[in-house]
Design a protein with these regions (language model features):
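Active-site-proximal loop/helix segment associated with metal-binding centers of metalloenzymes
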Residues: 27-36, 97-111, 155-162, 217
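Metallo-beta-lactamase
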Residues: 5-20, 46-48, 54-56, 60-63, 68-78, 80-132, 141-142, ...
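Short His-Asn-centered micro-motif
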Residues: 49-52, 73-75, 96-97
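Short, surface-exposed connector motifs at secondary-structure boundaries
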Residues: 43-46, 62-69
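Conserved beta-strand hairpin/beta-sheet module of binuclear metal-dependent hydrolase folds
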Residues: 9-58, 136-154
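Cys/His-rich short segments
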Residues: 1-3
Length: 225
């Protein structure tokens, strides 16, 4: 038996979920500042959340897993090599209208603040702030998985969810409003584009976001928790 080469390691399984197993793609791109991308397998086809660097070995592995039917680009910073992936798998791309100039070839646009059901168990939620067209993707109705782009991530040293003013490129006030939009979710996994992922126990998600919002209310000039 030969050891698996590093090129064949990715995608790596993160978690199994009734709405679709989730994989980390690796192969981060300098063009997206090393952002993470994720692959969701599903009965209605596979979805790539944000774009990794183009990689023939990664594409080969993804093809074995059923290919890619749709690409979701959460915001303008993390589009990376989306054109290569779309061409290789002949799949449609989704981006918010307000960030669409970063991927003008994208076939589909999310408009305004309305939640869009991309498929039965996958929703796109506009969360303007980090960029005007930022959005997150939510998988499942229970034990939800949130693909948060650059909107939120986890700080393991302080055990808090972070929304960062230092890395807000559009409107910080609107970003905090977008954090509030997510309070009623039941997130089990937070999978960001940058920063740490985190697994929440029941009830912890709401507590974490409330803590973030309380901190910012007391320290409006603070850049980051």
């Amino acid at each position: 038996m030969t050891a698996k080469s590093s090129a064949d390691v990715f995608p790596i399984l993160v978690t199994k979920h009734p709405a679709g197993d989730v994989y980390y793609c690796g192969w981060s791109s300098k063009r997206s500042f090393g952002a993470s991308s994720w692959l969701v397998l599903g009965a209605e086809g596979n979805v790539l959340i944000d774009s990794p660097r183009w990689s023939a070995p990664l594409a080969k592995q993804i093809k074995k897993m059923g290919g890619i039917n749709q690409i979701v680009l959460t915001h303008r910073d993390d589009v990376a090599d989306h054109a290569n992936w779309a061409k290789a798998f002949n799949c449609e791309r989704w981006i918010h209208q307000d960030d669409a100039d970063a991927a003008p070839e994208a076939e589909k646009q999310v408009i305004g603040l309305d939640v869009l059901s991309l498929r039965k168990n996958l929703k796109l939620i506009p969360t303007p702030g980090h960029t005007k067209g930022s959005m997150v993707a939510l998988l499942g109705d229970q034990q939800q998985i949130l693909f948060s782009g650059d909107h939120l991530w986890w700080n393991p040293k302080k055990s808090v969810t972070v929304a960062s003013k230092d890395y807000c490129w559009w409107n910080w006030t609107e970003q905090l409003k977008s954090v509030e939009r997510l309070l009623d979710l039941e997130v089990h996994w937070l999978l960001p584009g940058h920063g740490y992922a985190h697994q929440f126990k029941p009830g912890q998600w709401n507590e974490a976001l409330e803590q973030t919002l309380r901190h910012e209310a007391k320290s409006p000039s603070s850049g980051q928790i």
